[in-house]
Amino acid sequence: MSAPAPSPLAIVDAEPLPRQEEVLTDAALAFVAELLHRRFTRAVTNSSPRRADAAREIARTSTLDFLPETAAVRADDSWRVAGPAALNDRRVEITGPTDRKMTINALNSGAKVWLADFEEPSAPTWENVVLGQVNLSDAYTRNIDFTDERTGKTYALRPLKSWRPSSWPRGWHLNERHLVDPDGSFGARRVVVDFGLYFFHNAQRLLDLGKGPYFYLPKTESHLEARLWNDVFVFAQDYVGIPQGTVRATVLIETITAAYEMEEILYELRDHASGLNAGRWDYLFSIVKNFPATRPKFVLPDRNVTMTKLTMTAFMRRYTNCSSYCHNARASAAIGGMAAFIPSRDAEVNKVAFEKVRADKDREANDGFDGSWVAHPDLVPIAMESFDRCWHRPNQKDRLREDVHVEAADLIAVDSLEATTYAGSSSTAVQVGIRYIEAWLRGLGRVAIFNLMEDAATAEISRSQIWQWINAGVEFEHGEKATPIWPRKSRRGRKWRPVREELGEEPFAARDWQHAHDLVVQVSLDEDYADFLTLPAYERLRG
C-alpha cells in the first residue's frame, strides 16, 4: 500500500496577499510538508546540537584544524564535481532581493548569473516571502513589469541573451511563523519554504528554458550539512519527476568551520555541486561568533580599515586562495566576494569607488576565481572587464593553483590584519547597525548606507564588533576604552544630524529609531553572544 499523501502546511496569522493562490497551492504546501516533516525533521533537529557542540569546542581550545577523519577525501585526487555547461560562465553575478524592480534590473544588467536572494537582502515579511516567489515565476514566463509609484518610471524586461538564475533560500536555523504543521505543533523551516516553493513551481519550467534549478546554500557549517542538502535534492528531484543530478548548488563558505571542510562539502554534493563562494564579511562575523573575545589575537580592527585592507592581508588572501585552489582542483567554480558600492551623483566619489572595485576584481581574477559578485547593475561592466582582461574564456577551472599552500592556523590568523580600532568608527558601527535594523523592521532587507548597498551581513558584523570590543576591553587610538556606555549614547546629539539632513526632519521623525536602537544595543551588550541579530529582530517584525 502506498503512503498517504502528506497534508499541506497551514497558513496562520497572515493577511491574504494578491496572487498568493498561485504560489501557496495545496500541492506545493504538501511538498514542503513532506520535505520538512516526513523526511528531514530528524536530520535538521540533530544539526543544531552538532553546531552547539562544535562552537563549545572552538571556544574551549581557541583553535581549529582540518578533520583527520576525512583526510582520505582530501587526499583522493580522482573525484570531481559535475558542473553543468549551463553554469560554465559565471564571470559576473548580480545579487539582490526578489522584488519586481530588482528582478527586472538584474535580468537586464548583462550579468551572467542573477542571484535571487531570499536571505540577507530580504526582510522576511510574509509579503516578501510570497510575492518574491510570484516575481520569480513571472520573470521566467517573461510576464513581469513594474511602475514606480513615486517616480512614475516604468521597468520592463529587455530581450534576454545569456542569463542564469540562482535562488538563495534562507538558512536552516530560522522558522517561518506563517506556515505551520496542520496540528499547529511547530513552524516550517524557512529554508524549506523558500527552496520547496521555488523548486516545486520552477524546476521543470527552468529546464524547458534550457536552464535549471540552481541554488546558493547559505550558513553551511559542515560537510554533514552538505550531506543533508544532497539528500534533499535527491528526494525533491524524484518527487517532481526530473532526472537526478539536475539540481546544481553553490555553497557559501561564510562560516569558519566550513572553511576547514571545503573539499568535504564539495564531495558530499559532488553530483549536485557547481562551486563555492568566498563570503568574506560573514566569514569574519563567524570568527567573532566562535572565538573568545578575551583572546586579543581574535579581535577584529576597525571596520573601515578592514574594508580597505581586508583582501590584501595574508590572513584573508590565504582564505580566498584556499577557496580558489579547492574549487578549481575539483573542477567547481570559484566565486569571489561582493562589490557593494552604489553609484553616486558625485563623479569624484564614483571615480574613487570604481577604481577600488576594479582593483578588487582584478585581484580575484588573478587569484584564480571564475567570477565575482556585484550589487548594482552599473558595476557589471567594470567587473566583467577585470575577468575578460585576465583570461579570454568563460572560466579558469583548468588553473589549479598548485602554488597555494595553506596551513590550518592561516585561516584564523586575524592578528595579521595589523590595524587600529578608532573611537569614531565605533560610533559608525553603532549607527550602521541601527540604520540597517530600522529599515529591516520596515520590511527592507537591502539598504543604501554611506554609498554602500548593505544587507544583513552588515548589521551582523557591526553589532559583532561592538560586542567583541566591549568584551575584549579594547582601547581606541586615544586611550578611550570600549565600554557599555558608548552604544547607549549613540543616538544622542550631533551624531544623528547627518541622518536628519539626509532624510529630512519629517521622514526622520516618522521612523522608529528607538526600537532599532534598543535592539542593536541589546544584542551588543548581552553577556552571551546572540547567534543571529535577525532572530530577536524577527520577533519585532510586522507582517
Swiss-Prot record:
GO cellular component, as recorded: cytoplasm
- Compartment annotation: Cytoplasm
Q: Which Pfam families match?
A: MS_C (PF20659), MS_N (PF20656), MS_TIM-barrel (PF01274)
| TM segment ranges | none
Catalytic reactions of this protein: glyoxylate + acetyl-CoA + H2O = (S)-malate + CoA + H(+)
UniProt keyword DNA repair, yes or no: no
Pathway stated in the Swiss-Prot or TrEMBL entry: Carbohydrate metabolism; glyoxylate cycle; (S)-malate from isocitrate: step 2/2
Any one of the GO BP annotations: glyoxylate cycle
Is rRNA-binding given among the entry's keywords? Answer: no
EC number(s): the record gives: 2.3.3.9
Q: Which domain of life is it from?
A: Bacteria
Keyword annotations: Cytoplasm, Glyoxylate bypass, Transferase, Tricarboxylic acid cycle
InterPro entries in UniProt: Malate_synth_C_sf, Malate_synth_sf, Malate_synthA, Malate_synthase_CS, Malate_synthase_TIM, MS_C, MS_N, MS_N_TIM-barrel_dom
Q: Which SUPFAM superfamilies match?
A: Malate synthase G
Q: Name one GO molecular function term.
A: malate synthase activity
Among PANTHER family, the record links this protein to: MALATE SYNTHASE, MALATE SYNTHASE 1-RELATED
Q: How does it assemble?
A: Homodimer.
Which protein family is named in the record?
A: Belongs to the malate synthase family.
How is this protein named in the record?
Malate synthase
| Organism from which the protein derives | Streptomyces arenae
Report which gene this protein is encoded by: aceB
